[in-house]
Amino acid sequence: DERHDRRISETLEVRGAQLRFEGKSQRKPLDLLKALIALGGRDVPAHVLIELLWPEPLEDGGQKALEITVHRLRRLLLSDDAVRVTDRRVTLDATLAWVDAWTLERMLAALVGTGGAPEPAIEGLEAAAARMFELYGGEFLAGEPEAPWLIPIRNRIAGRFQRIVLRLGAHW
């Protein structure tokens, strides 16, 4: 399976094997992955990532540092196609990288869109609730220091999760 897995619980699995990271060698690629996920993962402007990851001014404006870090992240994910850079925009390929936070957000958005509890199939609702609880392991990237770019996704996921839990509770 060519899918990669980035979990809220701070683990990274590549082709089913959990990776362990020691030292600083993988810090920037992992920071890039976290930032990409937090910013939606699709067409994230390179300058935004550069400002987040290298707040201190760099000679070339950070472009070379970003290129090197993208290359290192691709190696880490075992796929040159997992991260694309087109027209100074960076994308994490969702067909190659499965992100539990994105799956959870889609699930929560769908449940919010149906009023939180689709009536036709209670067993389907129970399965959706079980999956939602499985995916939501707590605050998004809870072990990370408070960063301005993490706050929106943390609040969005937590808020939607709380609203859905309250709505689901009303049905049981």
Predicted regions and their residues:
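Short, Lys/Arg-enriched N-terminal segment that forms or immediately precedes the first helix
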Residues: 8-21
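Short acidic, hydrophobic short linear motifs in intrinsically disordered regions
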Residues: 43-51
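C-terminal flanking helix
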Residues: 70, 74-81
